[in-house]
């Protein structure tokens, strides 16, 4: 069975594991998912990620980050652009998540960037997700 929206599946797995206070979460890997994981790591939402060879395909494993008394680093995740309704933003009209406290992940011609990086480079693109 094919998956209609692998990014939404990734975000749902991370959200569910985060809410259940799991230490790690695994999922099928792709270049796009690995790039999203890299952005989450750069922004401090996860500890680390690894891509491992499985019997069939590759597996992406994220190590979730918690502070002090198991307080979650990720308060929320939201898929913005969906297969049925794509959402694009110009470089002059990029969204800010919670007034700059969160991160918008944007797919641009220069690869996946955060909203701040895209603003600095002056590029727009498809708004994939919000993380706060």
Swiss-Prot record:
NCBIfam families listed in its UniProt record: PRK00136.1
Pfam families referenced in this protein's UniProt entry, alphabetically: Ribosomal_S8
Subunit structure: Part of the 30S ribosomal subunit. Contacts proteins S5 and S12.
Organism name: Corynebacterium efficiens (strain DSM 44549 / YS-314 / AJ 12310 / JCM 11189 / NBRC 100395)
GO biological process terms, semicolon-separated: translation
Family: Belongs to the universal ribosomal protein uS8 family.
Job of this protein: One of the primary rRNA binding proteins, it binds directly to 16S rRNA central domain where it helps coordinate assembly of the platform of the 30S subunit.
Taxon lineage: Bacteria, Bacillati, Actinomycetota, Actinomycetes, Mycobacteriales
A single cellular component GO annotation: ribosome
Name of the protein this chain belongs to: Small ribosomal subunit protein uS8
UniProt keyword list: Ribonucleoprotein, Ribosomal protein, RNA-binding, rRNA-binding
GO terms, molecular function: rRNA binding; structural constituent of ribosome
């Amino acid at each position: 069975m094919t998956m209609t929206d692998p990014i939404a599946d990734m975000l749902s797995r991370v959200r569910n594991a985060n809410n259940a206070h799991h230490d790690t979460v695994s999922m099928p890997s792709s270049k796009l998912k690995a790039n999203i994981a890299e952005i989450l790591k750069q922004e401090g939402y996860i500890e680390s990620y690894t891509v491992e060879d499985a019997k069939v395909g590759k597996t992406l494993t994220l190590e979730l980050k918690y502070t002090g008394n198991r307080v979650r680093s990720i308060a929320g995740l939201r898929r913005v652009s969906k297969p049925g309704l794509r959402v694009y933003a110009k470089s002059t009209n990029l969204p800010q998540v919670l007034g700059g406290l969160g991160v918008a992940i944007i797919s641009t011609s220069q690869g996946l960037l955060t909203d701040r990086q895209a603003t600095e480079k002056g590029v727009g693109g498809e708004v994939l997700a919000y993380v706060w």
